[in-house]
Amino acid sequence: DKETLEVTPGAPGYEFDVKDATAKMRRQGSEDLRIPLTITQPTVSDEDIYFQDVLGHCEPPYSNNPKRITNLELACKALDGLILQPGEEFSYNDTLGERTAEKGYQPAPAYSGTTLVDSLGGGICQVSSTLYLASVYAELTILERVNHGYPVHYIPYGMDATVNWGFTDLKMRNDSDLPVKFRAEASDGYVRIDVLGTETRDYDIQMTYSVGGRYVKTFKSKYDKATGE
């Protein structure tokens, strides 16, 4: 329903060959006859209807480090297809779980304070940062987020999100009335994350930042889609 945004669940349907049934009826001269029915399934799923629009998108490039790329791919795989129902909370650490060698995570460069060191699962902060910024554009409610102690090269200043198993996490909640879904991949030199859902807003979001000495301030602006103001 375009007014209420309610989705009527799909159900199987039935079809038959009208011309064939009409011909049989004429040949038999009777209104009682057997007609083979074909069961048809809905061509559009409930999920297709709910997740037609991109509510938030972020697509930063990554460096050509095979071990780091493996970690990016594993993190994206854990996120891809995840659905947040209205009121549901999300935890990046809970979704990925502990980053272990048994799960395929590799030692790769990661920030420890302001220093780059090889760490198991190095690189997954690029995925959490990408998800964070996409979620800001989608206007999910950010419950927990910590930036790195040093500017990172792959995301605009002040818009990153570091994670560390057992310590820092990225958490958010879907406070809208409709479900959202994450689409995530690491391929062709880019981490791509979309927050999919049903667009109901009449404005666009723009994120900017300013640097003053050692500090970065971020700003979120809203612009009317019709006027751009």
Q: Language-model segments: which ranges?
A:
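Well-ordered beta-sheet/strand-loop patches within structured domains
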Residues: 1-229
